[in-house]
């Protein structure tokens, strides 16, 4: 049976993650407060950041940058957008 969480990103109760997606306290906070749907949205945003900013996951600075962006995305003012990003029209 799926567990539900009060998702901090979506602002509603939704299906939670099966396990902490990131190590440490940040992973625990995400597991307890972020839904599966919101995590999927972050993965898409993270992929865009990696591709547009040409980040190398072998670079410790890039990994720290993404961790900072992930925390801002869920618990802060929101993650940065790549320079020149224009959101798709709805």
Swiss-Prot record:
Q: Name one GO cellular component term.
A: cytosol
Its keywords, alphabetically, are: Iron
Q: Does the keyword Iron apply?
A: yes
GO biological process terms held by the UniProt record: cellular response to oxidative stress
Record carries keyword Calcium: no
Gene Ontology terms for molecular function: iron ion binding
Q: Which InterPro entries match?
A: Fe_traffick_prot_YggX, Fe_traffick_prot_YggX_sf
Family per similarity comment: Belongs to the Fe(2+)-trafficking protein family.
Q: What does this protein do?
A: Could be a mediator in iron transactions between iron acquisition and iron-requiring processes, such as synthesis and/or repair of Fe-S clusters in biosynthetic enzymes.
- Record-given protein name: Probable Fe(2+)-trafficking protein
Species of origin reads Nitrosomonas eutropha (strain DSM 101675 / C91 / Nm57)
